[in-house]
C-alpha cells in the first residue's frame, strides 16, 4: 500500500514541496483507514459519548469513567478506564503473536491514562468450526491471549466466541481492557508544555510490525500468511509486566505529564499524535532511539511497531528520575527530543527527514464519502425439524456450546478481584476502593447482524445490558469495536452503517454513553467480506460483590421475564443449523425500564438464579441453567414449539425465585412475566412443549455442550 495520488497531492500542497520518503510513509500510515477512520468517522457522530460519569471520552488512548459512590450515588474519586482494540489481520497471518500483541496493545492504552489494568475481555470470531484452518486459528489465538494475559497478571474474565462461514478468510480478534485509577493519577495523551522532554520508554526498537497500520487498512489476499508476516509484531509479555509496574511507579511519583503507547505507526504515530492533541510540535532526534537491530534507517525507526514501548512527556528536571525507574525495571529509556511550539520535526544522521504540521499529520486526512445500499431483511422460509433433533443440534452447536475450553486456559482470578467468573452472563469484579461491584460483558452475534444489521446491533447492545442487569448491576458505559468488510462496496458499507446506527440508537435509549472504541474495516478476503460485527464491551455497577448465578439452586419457581414479541427465528442458531430464513425478532418497547427492573429483581434475596435468553434461545438458556439442580418446565400453552424454544429475541431473562409475586410486582407495567415451571433437585431438564416432551440429565446436556473441548483435546 502507498500514499494515493490524491493524498500525495494534498500533502505536497501542504508542505510546499515533495514529501521526503519518511514523510510519505508517515502520511501513508497515519492517513490510513486504520488510523484516520476515513470511512467511518462521518458515521460516529451518531454515538452519544457524554454523561455525568464520563471524565474522558473518545479520542484518547482509553476512556475514563467515574464510579458511583454506593452510598450517595454521586461520582466517587475512583475511576475506571475502558478501551477496546482489534488485531484482526495480524491474527490471521500469525494467530499466536497477532492475538498476544493485541492484548499488549490494549493494556498499554490503559496504562497511558495512569491506570492499572484489572480485567480483560476477548471477543473472537472464526470460520466454520468444522474446518481445520478455523481450528488452527482458534487454538493459536486462544494460546496467544492466554500466554500474554497470564504472564502479565491481568485476568481475562469475560468474552465471547462465534463461528460463521464468512470469517474463514478473515478472523476477528477484539480485546477490551478495564483499568483502575483515580482523580489524582489521571494522565492523558495531550502534550502540555513546550520545553518538556519526549522520552521513549520500554523495549528496544526493531523492525517488526513495519507498516502495520497500512497493512490493517487493506483486504487480505491469498498469500497473506506468508507475504504479510513482517507486518505482524512480536510481543514479550515479561517486558510488558515490567513496563506495567514501572508505569505505575512513574504515575505514583507524578513524573509523567502526558503519555501515549506505541501502537499503530509506531513512534511516528505516538509522538505526532501526542503533540498534535496539545496543539504543539516536537523536535525528535531519531538517532537517540535505543535499537535492538543494527543499521536501522529513519523510516524503520519511525514506523516499526515493536511492542512494549511508551512515549512520555517529562519535565526536564524529572528525566533522571524516569531513567532511574527504567533502570530499576531493566527497561530502555531514551530522551529522544523536545515538545515545541512549532512543527513536528524529526532528524536522522544530521539531516531533517520530517518537517510538517503535527495536527495536519495526525488529523488532516480527508474523509471518504461512500455510496451505500440499505440492507433488507429476508423473507420467511422456516425449516421444520422435529423438536428433539432441533434441541440437540442447537445445544451442541459450537456457537452455543460450552466455552470452558477457552476460559480455563486464562488465569481469570489473578488480582483477587474476580467475584463472578467466566461462564456466567457477565463477570463481576470487586472494586474495593469504591465499594462497588463492576460487571463486565462483551460480545456480538454475527448471525444477528448478518440477518439485520440495524436491529441485530440494537440486540447486541440490549443483550450486553441484560447480561449486566441479570447480575444486579446497572449499565455504566460502553466501548465498541466496529468490524466490517471493504467499505468501498456499497452493500458492505450499507451493512456497516446499519450496525453503527443500531448500536448508537439502543445505547442512547438505555442511557449508556459510548465513551470510546475502535473501527476495523477492509476485513475482506478472496472468500468475501465478514458479516458486519459490532463488538460491544459494557460495564455496570452495583453495591457489593454478590450476584445470583446462572445455575439453578433447585428451590424456586421458574419465570421468564420480558417480551419476546412474535418470537421470529431470524438470526437464530436454529436457522444456522437447519437452513431457512426469517425476519429478525422485534425488540421490547421500553428496554431501559426493563433493564432497571431486572437489576432490582436480581438483587432480591428471593432470587436464586438469573440467566438471559439470547444465543440459542430459551432452549439453550434452560440447558445452561441445569447442573446439580434441574428444572421441570411446561410450555404446553405454546402453539409453536420451535419459536418458543429457539427464537433469540433478546430482552428476556429466566429467573429462579421463591417469591414470584415480588417479581411480577416489580415488572408490572414494564414487561410480561410467564411462569414456566419449577427448579428441582433431580439434576434433569424435563421439558414439555405442546404435546411433546423432552428429558435430559445434566450429564446428557454436558455431553452435548462439550463439542469444543472434546474436539480440541
Curated annotation (Swiss-Prot):
GO CC, alphabetical: cytoplasm
Biological-process GO terms, alphabetical: 'de novo' IMP biosynthetic process
Entry keywords, A to Z: ATP-binding, Cytoplasm, Ligase, Magnesium, Metal-binding, Nucleotide-binding, Purine biosynthesis
Main subcellular localisation: cytoplasm
Active site positions, chain numbering: 34, 87 (proton acceptor)
Amino-acid positions noted as binding Mg(2+) 1 in the UniProt annotation, renumbered to this chain: 85, 518
UniProt: Mg(2+) 2 binding residues: 109, 261
Bias type Basic and acidic residues, positions: 1-17
Binding site for ATP: 37, 480, 517
Catalytic activity, as annotated: N(2)-formyl-N(1)-(5-phospho-beta-D-ribosyl)glycinamide + L-glutamine + ATP + H2O = 2-formamido-N(1)-(5-O-phospho-beta-D-ribosyl)acetamidine + L-glutamate + ADP + phosphate + H(+)
UniProt GO MF annotations: ATP binding; magnesium ion binding; phosphoribosylformylglycinamidine synthase activity
Keyword Plastid: no
Amino acids binding substrate: 86-89, 108, 233, 305-307, 520
Location in the cell: Cytoplasm
Pathway entry: Purine metabolism; IMP biosynthesis via de novo pathway; 5-amino-1-(5-phospho-D-ribosyl)imidazole from N(2)-formyl-N(1)-(5-phospho-D-ribosyl)glycinamide: step 1/2
Top-level enzyme category: ligase
Keyword check for Metal-binding: yes
Region described as Disordered: spans on this chain: 1-20
Assigned EC number: 6.3.5.3
Summary of the function given for this chain in its UniProt record: Part of the phosphoribosylformylglycinamidine synthase complex involved in the purines biosynthetic pathway. Catalyzes the ATP-dependent conversion of formylglycinamide ribonucleotide (FGAR) and glutamine to yield formylglycinamidine ribonucleotide (FGAM) and glutamate. The FGAM synthase complex is composed of three subunits. PurQ produces an ammonia molecule by converting glutamine to glutamate. PurL transfers the ammonia molecule to FGAR to form FGAM in an ATP-dependent manner.
Family: Belongs to the FGAMS family.
Subunit structure: Monomer. Part of the FGAM synthase complex composed of 1 PurL, 1 PurQ and 2 PurS subunits.
Protein name from the UniProt record: Phosphoribosylformylglycinamidine synthase subunit PurL
Amino acid at each position: 500500500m502507498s500514499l494515493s495520488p490524491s493524498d500525495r497531492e494534498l500533502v505536497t500542497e501542504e508542505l510546499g514541496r515533495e514529501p521526503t520518503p519518511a514523510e510519505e510513509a508517515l502520511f501513508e500510515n497515519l492517513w490510513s483507514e486504520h488510523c484516520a477512520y476515513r470511512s467511518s468517522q462521518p458515521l460516529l457522530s451518531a454515538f452519544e459519548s457524554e454523561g455525568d460519569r464520563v471524565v474522558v471520552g473518545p479520542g484518547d488512548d482509553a476512556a475514563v469513567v467515574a464510579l458511583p459512590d454506593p452510598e450517595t450515588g454521586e461520582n466517587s474519586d475512583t475511576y475506571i478506564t475502558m478501551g477496546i482494540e482489534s488485531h484482526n489481520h495480524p491474527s490471521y497471518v500469525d494467530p499466536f503473536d497477532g492475538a498476544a500483541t493485541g492484548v499488549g496493545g490494549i493494556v498499554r492504552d490503559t496504562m497511558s491514562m495512569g491506570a492499572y489494568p484489572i480485567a480483560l475481555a476477548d471477543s473472537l470470531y472464526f470460520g466454520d468450526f468444522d474446518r481445520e484452518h478455523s481450528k488452527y486459528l482458534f487454538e493459536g489465538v486462544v494460546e496467544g491471549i492466554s500466554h500474554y494475559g497470564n504472564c502479565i497478571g491481568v485476568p481475562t474474565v469475560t468474552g465471547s466466541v462465534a463461528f460463521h462461514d464468512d470469517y474463514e478468510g478473515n478472523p476477528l480478534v477484539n480485546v477490551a481492557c478495564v483499568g483502575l485509577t483515580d482523580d489524582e493519577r489521571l494522565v492523558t495523551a495531550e502534550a502540555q508544555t513546550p520545553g518538556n522532554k519526549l522520552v521513549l520508554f520500554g523495549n528496544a526498537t526493531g523492525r517488526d510490525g513495519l507498516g502495520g497500520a497500512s497493512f490493517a487498512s487493506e483486504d487480505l489476499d491469498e498469500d497473506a500468511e506468508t507475504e504479510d508476516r513482517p507486518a505482524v509484531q512480536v510481543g514479550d509479555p515479561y517486558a510488558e509486566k515490567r513496563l506495567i509496574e514501572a508505569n505505575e511507579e512513574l504515575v505514583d511519583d507524578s513524573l509523567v505529564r502526558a503519555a501515549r503507547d506505541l501502537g499503530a505507526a509506531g513512534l511516528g504515530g505516538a509522538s505526532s499524535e501526542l503533540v498534535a492533541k496539545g496543539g504543539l510540535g516536537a523536535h525528535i532526534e531519531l538517532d537517540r532511539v535505543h535499537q535492538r537491530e543494527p543499521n536501522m534507517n529513519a523510516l524503520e525507526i519511525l514506523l516499526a511497531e515493536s511492542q512494549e514501548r511508551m512515549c512520555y512527556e517529562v519535565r526536564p528536571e524529572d528525566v533522571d528520575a524516569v531513567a532511574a525507574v527504567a533502570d530499576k525495571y531493566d527497561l530502555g529509556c531514551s530522551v529522544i527530543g523536545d515538545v515545541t511550539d512549532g512543527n513536528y520535526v524529526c532528524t536522522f544522521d544530521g539531516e531533517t527527514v520530517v518537517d510538517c504540521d503535527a495536527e495536519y499529520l495526525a488529523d488532516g486526512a480527508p474523509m471518504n464519502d461512500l455510496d451505500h445500499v440499505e440492507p433488507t431483511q429476508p423473507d420467511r422460509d422456516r425449516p421444520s425439524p422435529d423438536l428433539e433433533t432441533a434441541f440437540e443440534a442447537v445445544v451442541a452447536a459450537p456457537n452455543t456450546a460450552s466455552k470452558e475450553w477457552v476460559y480455563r486456559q486464562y488465569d481469570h482470578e489473578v488480582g483477587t478481584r474476580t467475584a463472578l467468573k467466566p461462564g456466567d452472563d457477565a463477570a463481576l469484579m470487586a472494586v474495593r476502593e469504591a465499594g462497588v461491584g463492576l460487571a463486565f460483558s462483551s460480545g456480538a452475534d454475527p448471525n444477528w447482524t448478518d440477518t439485520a444489521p440495524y436491529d441485530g446491533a440494537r440486540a447486541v447492545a440490549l443483550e450486553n445490558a441484560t447480561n449486566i442487569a441479570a447480575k444486579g448491576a446497572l449499565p455504566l458505559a460502553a466501548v465498541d469495536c466496529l468490524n466490517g468488510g471493504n467499505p468501498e462496496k456499497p452493500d458492505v458499507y450499507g451493512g456497516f452503517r446499519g450496525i453503527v446506527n443500531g448500536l448508537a440508537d439502543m445505547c442512547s435509549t438505555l442511557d449508556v454513553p459510548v465513551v470510546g472504541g475502535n473501527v476495523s474495516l477492509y476485513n475482506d478476503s478472496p472468500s468475501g467480506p465478514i458479516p458486519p460485527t459490532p463488538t460491544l464491551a459494557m460495564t455496570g455497577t452495583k453495591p457489593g460483590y454478590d450476584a445470583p448465578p446462572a445455575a439453578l439452586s433447585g428451590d424456586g419457581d421458574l419465570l421468564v421475564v420480558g417480551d419476546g414479541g412474535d418470537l421470529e427465528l431470524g438470526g437464530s442458531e436454529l436457522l444456522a443449523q437447519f437452513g431457512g430464513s426469517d425476519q429478525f425478532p422485534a425488540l421490547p418497547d421500553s428496554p431501559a425500564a426493563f433493564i432497571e427492573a431486572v437489576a432490582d429483581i436480581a438483587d432480591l434475596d428471593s432470587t436464586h438464579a438469573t440467566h438471559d435468553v439470547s444465543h440459542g434461545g430459551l432452549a439453550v438458556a434452560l440447558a445452561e441453567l441445569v447442573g446439580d439442580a434441574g428444572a421441570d418446565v411446561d410450555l404446553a400453552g405454546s402453539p409453536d414449539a420451535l419459536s418458543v424454544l429457539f427464537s433469540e429475541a433478546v430482552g428476556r431473562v429466566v429467573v429462579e425465585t421463591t417469591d414470584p409475586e415480588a417479581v411480577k410486582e416489580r415488572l408490572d407495567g414494564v414487561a410480561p412475566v410467564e411462569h414456566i415451571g419449577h427448579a428441582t433437585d433431580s439434576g434433569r431438564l424435563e421439558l414439555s412443549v405442546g404435546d411433546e416432551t423432552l428429558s435430559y440429565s445434566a450429564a446428557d446436556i454436558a455431553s452435548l455442550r462439550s463439542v469444543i473441548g472434546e474436539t480440541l483435546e
